Amino acid sequence: MAHKKGASSSRNGRDSNAQRLGVKRFGGQSVSAGEILVRQRGTHFHPGVNVGRGGDDTLFALSAGAVEFGTKRGRKTVNIVPAAAEA
């Protein structure tokens, strides 16, 4: 095996694509069922009322309503407050 880097070779030149993580819908925004709220690695935000968690820890809305961020037992949670029923 060569231990010298031969002519015009380089050990650099690799980089990974960004994962585009973060909050996608912020507090007070109205969402419909199935919309992604937070993309994350691990549970930085925990699912609350009307919020589901995917296999990659993505949080998504289970029903339509307004997004609400809060804390419960010292954990950051994301809830969906259902929109008021139309009369």
Swiss-Prot record:
Family matches, as SUPFAM superfamilies: Ribosomal L27 protein-like
Single GO term (MF): structural constituent of ribosome
Tree of life domain: Bacteria
GO biological process: translation
GO cellular component terms, semicolon-separated: cytosolic large ribosomal subunit
Extent of Polar residues compositional bias: 7-19
InterPro entries: Ribosomal_bL27, Ribosomal_bL27_CS
Region (Disordered) residue spans: 1-25
One Pfam family linked to the record: Ribosomal_L27
Keywords: Ribonucleoprotein, Ribosomal protein
Keyword Repressor attributed: no
HAMAP family (UniProt xref): Ribosomal_bL27
Family affiliation: Belongs to the bacterial ribosomal protein bL27 family.
Name by which UniProt lists this protein: Large ribosomal subunit protein bL27
Organism encoding this protein: Rhodococcus jostii (strain RHA1)
Species classification: Bacteria, Bacillati, Actinomycetota, Actinomycetes, Mycobacteriales
